[in-house]
Structure formats: structure tokens, C-alpha cells
Amino acid sequence: MAITDIFQLNNNDKWERYCDLLYSDDSLGFWLDISRMDVAINDFEDFNEIYSKAFDALESLENGSIANIDEGRQVGHYWLRNPKVAPSAEISDSITKEIQNISKFGASILNGEITNRHGKKYTDVFWIGIGGSGLGPLLIKESFKRESIGLNLHFLDNVDPEGISHKLNSILPNLDSTLFVVVSKSGGTPEPLIGMEQAMKFVLDHSQNWSSRAIAITSKGSKLDVLANNENWLDIFDLPDWVGGRTSITGAVGLLPAALIGADINKFLNGASQMDALTRVKDIKNNPAALLSLAWFKSGNGKGLRDMVVLPYRDRLEVFSRYLQQLVMESLGKKFDRDENQVNQGIAVYGNKGSTDQHAYVQQLRDGIDNFFVNFIEILHDPLEIVEVKNKRPGDYLSGFLQGTRSALTEGGRQNLTITFKSFDESSLGALIALFERAVSLYAELINVNAYNQPGVEAGKEAATKIIKLQKEIEELLDDGKQRTLNEINDALSSDSTESIYLILRKLSENSDHYSMIGNQSNPDKLIISKT
């Protein structure tokens, strides 16, 4: 049924459709409404066979099958919140032990059992991680950090020199009471490695010890693991090779920051585990992740033809759209399917928060190009300390704006769905994350792509490595002090990209007095390059 047809229904028919398509679970205080999406009741029967295969595939994954074929790895982030479902006692025991270690470490930091060199409590954490190793912890912080409780978190998630300088200098007043966390599965990823080296130099330049306040989250036996052990870092937590960065938030990557800000990590894990249980049901209509993935599939005709706009009506979920960008787009954005057919799949994700966005891009959503669906996220419970003033309750207005925007979009024929939680806490965030993780897994089965590899990301890393190698070759060539044109440099290095050489030298000449580019930049082919 088209969304325009839905809006034309009379009230009784709309209410009947709403009730037929509404999913709810009392134990989680959770509702999912897809009645304003392009989903028909008979879709449950029509999609039964393909979902039966998808459910079996997800069950096989949880049982330990090799899901990441490219790397020959299992995919086990679901085990992190319920070690009992892990495929071996060894894995189960290691997960349980790691949760206990993180809880104990967090408590020891917060209660002052572990202190800095002066016997004072730690006050801050400088977190170095890229992608999911940074976005997950940031989501945890934004969701649960409260003033005067726990440590203050600062994030370094890029190699922007200006950003590195600003963020390191911002912690200088509390440097003596700052912990440093470095997250890297392999220990060789350039961004966290460079961030670690800069942070380490900053600490040592200020005559302080690095290893006594440094913490690693990495795979056992990795370069970072070896370094942390050799230098006797404060602690090391495990990032198993069967956990991908974009699904690492229920492991040490998310649990450690949660523990350090005083959040309840067991409640967080239980919420995710409860949602996992709900989404193991092999019946589309009674499985919220299946309903969500079906709505995505029908909306974009199984080809990602519509973007996903994420609109949480809660400030603490403002970064959730960024978190979902990686989870959804890195998992589903694939050139080839599992049978090597070129499919160019994916769903684009963007968003911010309501009601702020009603004064921004919602104008286009209502009246512009119809190439999206909106995912509203609603929280019912409001904090008691915000009371009615002059006959106005902020929560009533927030809810009114959500309902009004929903209605306006539906009236305009724009598809939308709503996820509602009774309250927002560690449990509901865990459940929300698990819901999307499992919807992504099911959707990937529908379109026959591998949700657990990232060949495009790897291609970008390889290309960046080639550029760094080319820069070193350019620097070595110019060490003789001779003047050369860009074409002469290109020929000398047998390069296939004069443009790359130009871009490298333009950057070098701006940041070093040793390199000069003589001539008119509007005619780069005439420039004379030299090094003094």
C-alpha cells in the first residue's frame, strides 16, 4: 500500500492498520510502528520463504559459522552480551572474565583505588580510536555522562594536526590526572597509531610518565598488545578478532568508557541481550528486527533507493545518526553480492535530532524530493526536575513536534516509522543498538551481501598507503637539490599520477620552507620544484 493511500484511509481503517502492524514488548518498554511505511499485511506471507533463510543464516552466524569470508573469521558481537550463546566454553569464559575485569577496573578508578603518581583520583580520559572505536564510546558518553559523576571523556578520532593540537592542549590543565586509552585491533592502523604517538610525545614533553596511565584495547598478540606488555601499561583489554569495529560497542570498546563514567554496564548488556532474544523469533510479524528490515527493503525496493533519515527526539541521542551511518553504510554498502554480481547496494544514512531539525532540513523532507524514509525515535519519560512553567511542559511540546512532523510527512506522502521506548537508560540504548545490528544482518541476507567485510574501506587504506610511499619517494628524489618540473618528477619515479605528485608537493611546500614551487599555480604543469 502506497503511503499516499494510507493517508486517504478513514480513521477506523488507519487505526486498524496501526494496530495490525504495531509491535511492542512490555519487558523492554518498547514499541515499533511501521504502519506509515510501504508494508502490506500480505508481505508477511510473500516474504516468508526469504526470511526463513535469513533467520537460519543469522542462527548459523550466532552458532559460530565463518561469516566474514574475506578474513576467514567468525562474527561474534552477539556473544558479548550473552556469553552463554557463544559456540565454545573458552569463548564464553573469556567474555565473562573480560566483563568482570572491566567492571573491577572502572570501580577501582572511580573509588580511587587506582590513582595517579600523586595519589590523586583520575579525572579525565583521553580516548584515541577511529571509526567504531571512537563513535561507540562517543555515543556512550553523550548518552550517559552526568556532571560530577565519573571521568570526563575527550576523543581523538582523526589525524587532523589542528585537531590533535587543540585536543591535547585542552587536557593540559588536568594532564596529571588523565588516563589515555588507545583502541586498535591490529595496532597497525595509521590513525590510532599516529594519535598514540602524538599523545605519548605530549605526555613525555611535559615530564610525565606514559605507561603508568596508558590503557590498550586490542587483539591478543597484536603490535599494540606487544607494545603495551613490553612497556608495562596500566591495563590491556581484549578486542577479539571476531568483533568488528562497527559492532564493538557491547565489548570493551563500549564497556570501558561506560564503566569510567559510572554507567551500569550490566544493564546495558542486558538490554542488548533482551533485544537479541526478541529478534531470534522466526516469524516476521513477531520479530522487530525483521519488521524493521522489511520496511527498509520495501521502501527502497530492495535497492537502497531511499535514504534513511534518523530523527531521535532526545538530545542524548544526537550522535546516534552518526553511529548508524557507519553501522548501516559500512555493512550494506557493497559493490558485489556474495555471488560476485555487481549490485552497488547500500542505504545512505543521515540525521541529527528533533525538534531542532524541524527548523532545518525537515522543510525539504516535507516538500522536496521524495527519496528517503524517516526513522523517528521517541522517549516517553521526561525528567521530574523539569516542571511546568507558565502552563508549558517542554516534554509536551517535544512530543507535539514529533507527532506533528510525523503527520505532516505522512500527509505529504513521505514514508516514516517510529521506534518508542518508555524511558531512556542503559538498557534501552543496548536494546536500540541491538535492534539495528540485527536489522542490518537480516537486510543483508535479503539482498545477498556480506555485512561483515569492508572492501571499500580497505581499498581506501591501500590507496592512502601508496600516497604516503609516493611522498617518501618524492622527498628522497629532491634531496639532491635539483630543480624539476612535475612531469620530470613523475617520469623519474615512473608514477602513474602527476596529479598526486602535485598535490603532495603543494602540501609539502605549505608546511616546510625546504620545498618551493616556483611559477603560477594556475599552470601547475609549468611549475619548477626544488628542495633546499
Curated annotation (Swiss-Prot):
Residues annotated as catalytic: 330, 359, 461
Keyword Isomerase: yes
Catalytically driven reaction(s): alpha-D-glucose 6-phosphate = beta-D-fructose 6-phosphate
Transmembrane segments: none
Enzyme class, UniProt record, top EC level: isomerase
MF annotations from Gene Ontology: carbohydrate derivative binding; glucose-6-phosphate isomerase activity; monosaccharide binding
Pathway annotation: Carbohydrate biosynthesis; gluconeogenesis; Carbohydrate degradation; glycolysis; D-glyceraldehyde 3-phosphate and glycerone phosphate from D-glucose: step 2/4
Annotated family: Belongs to the GPI family.
Name assigned to this protein: Glucose-6-phosphate isomerase
Organism of derivation: Prochlorococcus marinus (strain NATL1A)
Gene name, Swiss-Prot/TrEMBL: pgi
